[in-house]
Protein backbone atom coordinates (compact mmCIF):
# COMPACT_ATOMS: atom_id res chain seq x y z
CA UNK A 1 0.00 0.00 0.00
CA UNK A 2 1.49 3.35 -0.99
CA UNK A 3 1.98 6.07 1.60
CA UNK A 4 0.22 9.34 0.87
CA UNK A 5 1.83 12.45 2.31
CA UNK A 6 -0.66 15.32 2.49
CA UNK A 7 -0.99 18.75 4.03
CA UNK A 8 -4.64 17.99 4.71
CA UNK A 9 -5.56 18.32 8.39
CA UNK A 10 -7.97 15.57 9.33
CA UNK A 11 -10.12 15.39 12.44
CA UNK A 12 -11.38 11.91 13.35
CA UNK A 13 -14.74 12.42 15.04
CA UNK A 14 -15.61 9.59 17.40
CA UNK A 15 -13.24 6.99 18.82
CA UNK A 16 -14.23 3.37 19.53
CA UNK A 17 -13.33 0.55 17.13
CA UNK A 18 -14.00 2.55 13.98
CA UNK A 19 -12.20 5.66 15.17
CA UNK A 20 -9.13 3.66 16.15
CA UNK A 21 -9.08 1.96 12.75
CA UNK A 22 -9.07 5.43 11.16
CA UNK A 23 -6.19 6.50 13.40
CA UNK A 24 -4.18 3.42 12.43
CA UNK A 25 -4.82 3.90 8.73
CA UNK A 26 -4.36 7.66 8.43
CA UNK A 27 -1.28 7.81 10.64
CA UNK A 28 0.23 5.10 8.46
CA UNK A 29 -0.48 7.31 5.46
CA UNK A 30 1.55 10.14 6.96
CA UNK A 31 -1.49 12.34 7.54
CA UNK A 32 -1.76 15.03 10.19
CA UNK A 33 -4.63 13.89 12.39
CA UNK A 34 -6.44 14.71 15.60
CA UNK A 35 -9.32 13.03 17.42
CA UNK A 36 -12.48 14.49 18.94
CA UNK A 37 -15.09 12.66 21.00
CA UNK A 38 -18.02 14.07 22.95
CA UNK A 39 -17.46 11.48 25.68
CA UNK A 40 -14.89 12.12 28.40
CA UNK A 41 -13.82 8.46 28.54
CA UNK A 42 -14.55 6.99 25.10
CA UNK A 43 -13.73 3.35 24.38
CA UNK A 44 -10.27 3.02 22.88
CA UNK A 45 -8.82 6.09 24.61
CA UNK A 46 -6.11 4.18 26.48
CA UNK A 47 -5.06 2.36 23.30
CA UNK A 48 -4.93 5.64 21.42
CA UNK A 49 -2.72 7.31 24.03
CA UNK A 50 -0.41 4.29 24.22
CA UNK A 51 -0.03 3.81 20.49
CA UNK A 52 -0.15 7.39 19.23
CA UNK A 53 0.82 9.67 22.12
CA UNK A 54 1.45 12.62 19.80
CA UNK A 55 -2.06 12.66 18.31
CA UNK A 56 -4.08 15.54 19.83
CA UNK A 57 -7.30 14.44 21.53
CA UNK A 58 -10.25 16.73 22.27
CA UNK A 59 -12.85 15.34 24.66
CA UNK A 60 -16.21 16.73 25.73
CA UNK A 61 -18.78 18.83 23.91
CA UNK A 62 -17.93 19.42 20.26
CA UNK A 63 -16.44 22.87 19.61
CA UNK A 64 -17.43 24.45 16.29
CA UNK A 65 -14.36 26.69 16.37
CA UNK A 66 -12.11 23.65 16.79
CA UNK A 67 -13.77 21.80 13.94
CA UNK A 68 -13.35 24.85 11.71
CA UNK A 69 -9.59 24.36 11.86
CA UNK A 70 -9.71 21.12 9.86
CA UNK A 71 -10.35 20.71 6.15
CA UNK A 72 -11.41 17.05 6.45
CA UNK A 73 -13.58 15.29 9.02
CA UNK A 74 -13.73 11.49 9.21
CA UNK A 75 -16.92 10.82 11.16
CA UNK A 76 -17.65 7.57 12.98
CA UNK A 77 -21.02 6.02 12.06
CA UNK A 78 -22.48 6.48 15.52
CA UNK A 79 -22.33 10.27 15.16
CA UNK A 80 -24.87 12.15 13.06
CA UNK A 81 -23.45 14.42 10.37
CA UNK A 82 -26.24 16.82 11.35
CA UNK A 83 -24.33 17.63 14.56
CA UNK A 84 -23.91 21.44 14.49
CA UNK A 85 -20.11 21.33 14.66
CA UNK A 86 -19.96 18.86 11.75
CA UNK A 87 -22.61 20.65 9.69
CA UNK A 88 -20.82 23.93 10.30
CA UNK A 89 -17.51 22.51 9.11
CA UNK A 90 -19.21 21.16 6.00
CA UNK A 91 -20.76 24.56 5.30
CA UNK A 92 -17.27 26.09 5.42
CA UNK A 93 -16.04 23.62 2.82
CA UNK A 94 -14.59 20.79 4.91
CA UNK A 95 -14.85 17.35 3.36
CA UNK A 96 -17.01 14.99 5.44
CA UNK A 97 -16.04 11.33 5.09
CA UNK A 98 -16.30 8.01 6.88
CA UNK A 99 -14.13 4.93 7.21
CA UNK A 100 -15.88 3.18 4.30
CA UNK A 101 -15.11 6.10 1.99
CA UNK A 102 -11.43 5.81 2.95
CA UNK A 103 -11.60 2.05 2.43
CA UNK A 104 -13.14 2.41 -1.03
CA UNK A 105 -10.25 4.64 -2.13
CA UNK A 106 -7.64 2.20 -0.84
CA UNK A 107 -9.04 -1.27 -1.58
CA UNK A 108 -7.24 -3.10 -4.39
CA UNK A 109 -9.61 -6.10 -4.55
CA UNK A 110 -13.30 -6.35 -5.51
CA UNK A 111 -15.95 -5.51 -2.91
CA UNK A 112 -19.26 -7.23 -2.23
CA UNK A 113 -21.42 -4.82 -0.21
CA UNK A 114 -24.59 -5.64 1.72
CA UNK A 115 -27.06 -3.39 3.49
CA UNK A 116 -30.71 -3.61 4.48
CA UNK A 117 -32.92 -3.19 7.50
CA UNK A 118 -32.85 -6.93 8.20
CA UNK A 119 -30.78 -9.96 7.27
CA UNK A 120 -27.56 -8.19 6.37
CA UNK A 121 -25.37 -9.93 8.96
CA UNK A 122 -26.69 -13.35 7.96
CA UNK A 123 -26.18 -12.63 4.25
CA UNK A 124 -22.73 -11.12 4.80
CA UNK A 125 -21.63 -14.15 6.82
CA UNK A 126 -23.09 -16.55 4.25
CA UNK A 127 -21.33 -14.83 1.34
CA UNK A 128 -18.03 -14.86 3.24
CA UNK A 129 -18.36 -18.59 3.93
CA UNK A 130 -19.32 -19.24 0.31
CA UNK A 131 -16.26 -17.35 -0.92
CA UNK A 132 -13.95 -19.35 1.38
CA UNK A 133 -15.52 -22.61 0.23
CA UNK A 134 -14.92 -21.52 -3.36
CA UNK A 135 -11.21 -21.05 -2.62
CA UNK A 136 -11.10 -17.27 -2.39
CA UNK A 137 -8.90 -15.29 0.01
CA UNK A 138 -11.76 -13.28 1.47
CA UNK A 139 -11.94 -10.74 4.28
CA UNK A 140 -15.29 -10.02 5.95
CA UNK A 141 -16.11 -7.01 8.09
CA UNK A 142 -17.42 -3.47 8.11
CA UNK A 143 -20.45 -3.09 10.35
CA UNK A 144 -19.72 -6.52 11.86
CA UNK A 145 -16.49 -7.89 13.26
CA UNK A 146 -13.40 -6.15 11.96
CA UNK A 147 -13.59 -2.48 10.89
CA UNK A 148 -13.15 -2.17 7.13
CA UNK A 149 -9.86 -0.25 7.24
CA UNK A 150 -8.25 -2.94 9.40
CA UNK A 151 -9.07 -5.50 6.69
CA UNK A 152 -6.63 -3.74 4.36
CA UNK A 153 -3.71 -4.87 6.52
CA UNK A 154 -4.58 -8.54 6.01
CA UNK A 155 -4.69 -8.68 2.22
CA UNK A 156 -7.45 -10.29 0.18
CA UNK A 157 -8.66 -11.02 -3.33
CA UNK A 158 -12.26 -10.28 -2.25
CA UNK A 159 -13.84 -8.13 0.45
CA UNK A 160 -17.34 -8.74 1.81
CA UNK A 161 -18.73 -5.81 3.78
CA UNK A 162 -21.85 -5.37 5.85
CA UNK A 163 -22.73 -1.68 5.76
CA UNK A 164 -25.17 0.33 7.84
CA UNK A 165 -27.07 3.38 6.67
CA UNK A 166 -24.89 5.43 9.03
CA UNK A 167 -21.73 4.25 7.25
CA UNK A 168 -23.24 4.88 3.83
CA UNK A 169 -24.14 8.49 4.69
CA UNK A 170 -20.45 9.37 4.53
CA UNK A 171 -19.51 7.16 1.57
CA UNK A 172 -19.31 9.06 -1.71
CA UNK A 173 -18.89 6.12 -4.12
CA UNK A 174 -18.12 2.57 -3.07
CA UNK A 175 -17.64 1.12 -6.56
CA UNK A 176 -18.59 -2.39 -5.44
CA UNK A 177 -18.43 -5.40 -7.74
CA UNK A 178 -21.83 -6.42 -6.35
CA UNK A 179 -24.11 -4.56 -3.96
CA UNK A 180 -27.57 -5.02 -2.52
CA UNK A 181 -30.19 -3.33 -0.40
CA UNK A 182 -31.87 -6.45 0.94
CA UNK A 183 -34.98 -4.68 2.23
CA UNK A 184 -36.09 -1.43 3.84
CA UNK A 185 -38.42 -1.06 6.81
CA UNK A 186 -38.67 1.60 9.50
CA UNK A 187 -35.51 1.70 11.61
CA UNK A 188 -33.39 4.38 13.25
CA UNK A 189 -36.27 6.86 13.06
CA UNK A 190 -34.67 8.53 16.06
CA UNK A 191 -31.83 9.58 13.74
CA UNK A 192 -33.60 10.20 10.43
CA UNK A 193 -36.37 12.76 9.87
CA UNK A 194 -38.42 10.25 7.86
CA UNK A 195 -38.25 6.90 6.08
CA UNK A 196 -37.23 8.57 2.81
CA UNK A 197 -34.01 9.91 4.34
CA UNK A 198 -33.22 6.43 5.69
CA UNK A 199 -33.98 4.90 2.27
CA UNK A 200 -31.77 7.43 0.48
CA UNK A 201 -28.86 6.61 2.79
CA UNK A 202 -29.23 2.90 2.00
CA UNK A 203 -29.34 3.63 -1.74
CA UNK A 204 -25.82 5.08 -1.67
CA UNK A 205 -24.47 1.50 -1.67
CA UNK A 206 -25.25 1.27 -5.39
CA UNK A 207 -23.08 4.22 -6.41
CA UNK A 208 -20.57 3.01 -8.97
CA UNK A 209 -21.43 -0.68 -8.50
CA UNK A 210 -21.13 -3.14 -11.39
CA UNK A 211 -23.86 -5.61 -10.34
CA UNK A 212 -26.98 -4.51 -8.47
CA UNK A 213 -28.64 -7.40 -6.64
CA UNK A 214 -32.35 -6.54 -6.39
CA UNK A 215 -34.99 -8.05 -4.10
CA UNK A 216 -38.11 -8.34 -6.27
CA UNK A 217 -40.25 -8.66 -3.13
CA UNK A 218 -39.27 -5.18 -1.89
CA UNK A 219 -39.59 -2.25 -4.28
CA UNK A 220 -37.22 -0.20 -2.12
CA UNK A 221 -34.39 -2.61 -3.00
CA UNK A 222 -34.25 -1.33 -6.60
CA UNK A 223 -31.58 1.29 -7.37
CA UNK A 224 -32.96 4.77 -7.96
CA UNK A 225 -30.11 5.52 -10.35
CA UNK A 226 -29.81 3.02 -13.21
CA UNK A 227 -26.08 3.48 -13.80
CA UNK A 228 -25.06 -0.07 -12.89
CA UNK A 229 -23.86 -2.41 -15.61
CA UNK A 230 -26.00 -5.40 -14.66
CA UNK A 231 -29.02 -6.35 -12.61
CA UNK A 232 -29.42 -9.73 -10.90
CA UNK A 233 -32.61 -10.43 -9.00
CA UNK A 234 -33.99 -12.66 -6.28
CA UNK A 235 -37.51 -13.18 -4.98
CA UNK A 236 -40.19 -15.76 -4.34
CA UNK A 237 -42.06 -17.44 -7.20
CA UNK A 238 -40.29 -15.49 -9.97
CA UNK A 239 -38.91 -18.12 -12.32
CA UNK A 240 -37.19 -15.79 -14.78
CA UNK A 241 -33.73 -15.59 -16.38
CA UNK A 242 -31.09 -13.83 -14.24
CA UNK A 243 -33.20 -14.48 -11.14
CA UNK A 244 -32.74 -16.64 -8.05
CA UNK A 245 -36.22 -17.68 -7.02
CA UNK A 246 -38.43 -20.48 -5.69
CA UNK A 247 -40.69 -23.08 -7.29
CA UNK A 248 -42.99 -25.60 -5.63
CA UNK A 249 -43.53 -29.18 -6.78
CA UNK A 250 -44.31 -32.56 -5.22
CA UNK A 251 -40.86 -32.67 -3.57
CA UNK A 252 -41.30 -29.32 -1.84
CA UNK A 253 -40.03 -25.77 -2.36
CA UNK A 254 -37.01 -25.48 -4.64
CA UNK A 255 -34.54 -22.59 -4.73
CA UNK A 256 -33.92 -21.99 -8.41
CA UNK A 257 -31.65 -20.12 -10.82
CA UNK A 258 -33.66 -19.36 -13.93
CA UNK A 259 -35.29 -22.68 -14.82
CA UNK A 260 -32.71 -24.78 -12.93
CA UNK A 261 -33.51 -26.36 -9.55
CA UNK A 262 -30.60 -25.77 -7.15
CA UNK A 263 -31.62 -27.14 -3.74
CA UNK A 264 -34.73 -27.81 -1.70
CA UNK A 265 -35.59 -25.33 1.03
CA UNK A 266 -35.98 -28.34 3.34
CA UNK A 267 -32.22 -28.96 2.98
CA UNK A 268 -31.47 -25.67 4.75
CA UNK A 269 -30.62 -25.61 8.46
CA UNK A 270 -32.01 -22.07 8.73
CA UNK A 271 -35.55 -21.48 9.98
CA UNK A 272 -38.14 -19.31 8.30
CA UNK A 273 -39.21 -17.99 4.92
CA UNK A 274 -37.11 -14.85 5.39
CA UNK A 275 -33.99 -17.03 5.58
CA UNK A 276 -34.84 -18.58 2.20
CA UNK A 277 -34.73 -15.00 0.91
CA UNK A 278 -31.37 -14.48 2.63
CA UNK A 279 -29.96 -17.59 0.94
CA UNK A 280 -31.19 -16.43 -2.47
CA UNK A 281 -29.56 -13.03 -1.90
CA UNK A 282 -26.25 -14.65 -0.91
CA UNK A 283 -26.30 -16.89 -3.98
CA UNK A 284 -26.96 -13.90 -6.23
CA UNK A 285 -24.10 -11.90 -4.70
CA UNK A 286 -21.71 -14.84 -4.96
CA UNK A 287 -22.74 -15.56 -8.54
CA UNK A 288 -22.12 -11.92 -9.47
CA UNK A 289 -18.63 -12.24 -7.97
CA UNK A 290 -17.87 -15.34 -10.03
CA UNK A 291 -18.06 -17.92 -7.24
CA UNK A 292 -18.67 -21.51 -8.31
CA UNK A 293 -22.22 -22.69 -7.65
CA UNK A 294 -21.60 -26.05 -5.98
CA UNK A 295 -19.49 -24.77 -3.05
CA UNK A 296 -22.06 -22.02 -2.50
CA UNK A 297 -24.87 -24.56 -2.33
CA UNK A 298 -22.91 -26.75 0.08
CA UNK A 299 -22.45 -23.77 2.42
CA UNK A 300 -26.16 -22.95 2.16
CA UNK A 301 -27.01 -26.52 3.19
CA UNK A 302 -24.75 -26.60 6.26
CA UNK A 303 -25.05 -23.01 7.52
CA UNK A 304 -26.83 -23.08 10.88
CA UNK A 305 -27.38 -19.36 11.29
CA UNK A 306 -26.17 -16.81 13.82
CA UNK A 307 -27.02 -16.42 17.51
CA UNK A 308 -30.18 -14.49 18.43
CA UNK A 309 -31.62 -14.68 14.91
CA UNK A 310 -34.64 -17.03 14.88
CA UNK A 311 -32.58 -19.41 17.01
CA UNK A 312 -34.33 -22.48 18.40
CA UNK A 313 -33.68 -22.72 22.16
CA UNK A 314 -35.72 -25.76 23.22
CA UNK A 315 -39.06 -27.57 23.04
CA UNK A 316 -40.88 -27.87 26.36
CA UNK A 317 -44.30 -29.50 26.77
CA UNK A 318 -44.84 -29.38 23.02
CA UNK A 319 -43.99 -25.66 22.78
CA UNK A 320 -41.00 -24.34 20.81
CA UNK A 321 -39.06 -21.40 22.25
CA UNK A 322 -37.37 -19.18 19.66
CA UNK A 323 -34.76 -16.49 20.35
CA UNK A 324 -34.93 -13.66 17.81
CA UNK A 325 -33.45 -10.96 20.03
CA UNK A 326 -31.78 -9.45 16.95
CA UNK A 327 -35.29 -8.54 15.74
CA UNK A 328 -34.69 -4.91 16.66
CA UNK A 329 -37.14 -3.29 14.25
CA UNK A 330 -40.72 -3.81 13.12
CA UNK A 331 -39.83 -5.34 9.76
CA UNK A 332 -37.70 -8.03 11.39
CA UNK A 333 -40.45 -8.99 13.80
CA UNK A 334 -43.12 -9.11 11.08
CA UNK A 335 -40.86 -11.43 9.07
CA UNK A 336 -40.22 -13.64 12.09
CA UNK A 337 -43.92 -13.95 12.99
CA UNK A 338 -44.99 -14.77 9.45
CA UNK A 339 -42.11 -17.19 8.88
CA UNK A 340 -42.37 -19.08 12.15
CA UNK A 341 -46.09 -19.49 12.77
CA UNK A 342 -46.53 -23.27 13.23
CA UNK A 343 -48.91 -25.26 11.04
CA UNK A 344 -50.96 -26.53 13.98
CA UNK A 345 -50.50 -23.74 16.51
CA UNK A 346 -49.98 -20.05 17.14
CA UNK A 347 -47.19 -17.67 18.16
CA UNK A 348 -46.92 -16.14 21.62
CA UNK A 349 -44.90 -13.01 20.91
CA UNK A 350 -42.64 -11.31 23.46
CA UNK A 351 -41.94 -7.79 22.21
CA UNK A 352 -40.99 -4.32 23.41
CA UNK A 353 -38.06 -2.12 24.33
CA UNK A 354 -36.79 1.12 22.80
CA UNK A 355 -38.63 1.53 19.50
CA UNK A 356 -36.31 4.25 18.15
CA UNK A 357 -39.29 6.29 16.97
CA UNK A 358 -40.72 3.49 14.81
CA UNK A 359 -44.32 3.09 13.65
CA UNK A 360 -45.61 -0.18 15.13
CA UNK A 361 -48.80 -0.30 13.04
CA UNK A 362 -47.39 -2.95 10.61
CA UNK A 363 -47.41 -5.41 13.54
CA UNK A 364 -51.20 -5.32 13.83
CA UNK A 365 -52.08 -7.64 10.95
CA UNK A 366 -49.53 -10.44 11.55
CA UNK A 367 -50.23 -10.40 15.29
CA UNK A 368 -53.97 -10.73 14.66
CA UNK A 369 -53.46 -13.51 12.11
CA UNK A 370 -50.68 -15.53 13.72
CA UNK A 371 -50.50 -14.88 17.47
CA UNK A 372 -52.35 -16.39 20.41
CA UNK A 373 -51.10 -13.76 22.85
CA UNK A 374 -48.78 -10.78 23.12
CA UNK A 375 -46.42 -10.23 26.06
CA UNK A 376 -44.99 -6.70 26.22
CA UNK A 377 -41.92 -5.36 27.99
CA UNK A 378 -39.89 -2.19 28.01
CA UNK A 379 -40.21 1.50 27.33
CA UNK A 380 -42.46 1.35 24.28
CA UNK A 381 -44.79 -1.44 25.42
CA UNK A 382 -47.68 1.01 25.47
CA UNK A 383 -47.05 2.17 21.90
CA UNK A 384 -47.03 -1.42 20.65
CA UNK A 385 -50.19 -2.19 22.60
CA UNK A 386 -52.05 0.74 21.05
CA UNK A 387 -50.82 -0.07 17.53
CA UNK A 388 -51.82 -3.74 17.71
CA UNK A 389 -55.18 -3.24 19.39
CA UNK A 390 -57.35 -5.85 21.05
CA UNK A 391 -57.09 -8.59 18.43
CA UNK A 392 -55.30 -10.93 20.87
CA UNK A 393 -54.89 -11.02 24.66
CA UNK A 394 -52.10 -8.75 25.90
CA UNK A 395 -49.95 -9.07 29.00
CA UNK A 396 -47.49 -6.56 30.48
CA UNK A 397 -44.29 -7.74 32.16
CA UNK A 398 -41.80 -5.71 34.18
CA UNK A 399 -38.92 -8.09 33.45
CA UNK A 400 -37.92 -10.65 30.86
CA UNK A 401 -38.26 -13.35 33.50
CA UNK A 402 -41.89 -12.40 34.05
CA UNK A 403 -42.43 -12.22 30.29
CA UNK A 404 -41.17 -15.77 29.78
CA UNK A 405 -43.40 -17.01 32.60
CA UNK A 406 -46.47 -15.28 31.14
CA UNK A 407 -45.70 -16.61 27.67
CA UNK A 408 -45.40 -20.15 29.01
CA UNK A 409 -48.78 -19.84 30.72
CA UNK A 410 -50.40 -18.60 27.50
CA UNK A 411 -48.88 -21.25 25.22
CA UNK A 412 -50.58 -24.47 24.16
CA UNK A 413 -48.96 -27.60 22.67
CA UNK A 414 -47.99 -26.91 19.06
CA UNK A 415 -47.37 -23.20 19.73
CA UNK A 416 -44.14 -21.22 19.49
CA UNK A 417 -42.99 -18.67 22.05
CA UNK A 418 -41.07 -16.08 20.05
CA UNK A 419 -38.85 -13.37 21.50
CA UNK A 420 -38.73 -10.86 18.65
CA UNK A 421 -38.90 -7.45 20.29
CA UNK A 422 -39.24 -5.09 17.28
CA UNK A 423 -37.17 -2.72 19.43
CA UNK A 424 -33.66 -1.95 20.56
CA UNK A 425 -32.63 -3.34 23.92
CA UNK A 426 -30.85 -0.47 25.65
CA UNK A 427 -33.71 0.45 28.00
CA UNK A 428 -33.36 -2.86 29.87
CA UNK A 429 -30.22 -4.67 28.62
CA UNK A 430 -26.63 -4.00 27.57
CA UNK A 431 -27.45 -4.92 23.97
CA UNK A 432 -29.43 -7.46 21.95
CA UNK A 433 -26.85 -10.15 22.76
CA UNK A 434 -27.45 -9.66 26.48
CA UNK A 435 -31.22 -9.79 25.94
CA UNK A 436 -30.93 -12.98 23.90
CA UNK A 437 -28.58 -14.66 26.36
CA UNK A 438 -30.92 -13.86 29.25
CA UNK A 439 -33.87 -15.28 27.31
CA UNK A 440 -31.95 -18.45 26.51
CA UNK A 441 -30.93 -18.89 30.16
CA UNK A 442 -34.49 -18.33 31.39
CA UNK A 443 -35.96 -20.80 28.89
CA UNK A 444 -33.35 -23.45 29.62
CA UNK A 445 -34.19 -23.06 33.32
CA UNK A 446 -37.91 -23.70 32.92
Curated annotation (Swiss-Prot):
Similarity comment: Belongs to the MurCDEF family.
Record-level GO cellular component terms: cytoplasm
Subcellular location, record wording: Cytoplasm
Single annotated GO MF: ATP binding
Annotated positions binding ATP: 116-122
Name of the protein in its database record: UDP-N-acetylmuramoylalanine--D-glutamate ligase
Catalyzed reactions per annotation: UDP-N-acetyl-alpha-D-muramoyl-L-alanine + D-glutamate + ATP = UDP-N-acetyl-alpha-D-muramoyl-L-alanyl-D-glutamate + ADP + phosphate + H(+)
Function: Cell wall formation. Catalyzes the addition of glutamate to the nucleotide precursor UDP-N-acetylmuramoyl-L-alanine (UMA).
Keywords: ATP-binding, Cell cycle, Cell division, Cell shape, Cell wall biogenesis/degradation, Cytoplasm, Ligase, Nucleotide-binding, Peptidoglycan synthesis
Pathway: Cell wall biogenesis; peptidoglycan biosynthesis
EC class: ligase
InterPro entries to which the protein is assigned, alphabetical: Mur-like_cat_sf, Mur_ligase_C, Mur_ligase_C_dom_sf, Mur_ligase_cen, MurD
UniProt record, GO biological process: cell division; cell wall organization; peptidoglycan biosynthetic process; regulation of cell shape
Lineage: Bacteria, Pseudomonadati, Pseudomonadota, Gammaproteobacteria, Pseudomonadales
Membrane recorded as keyword: no
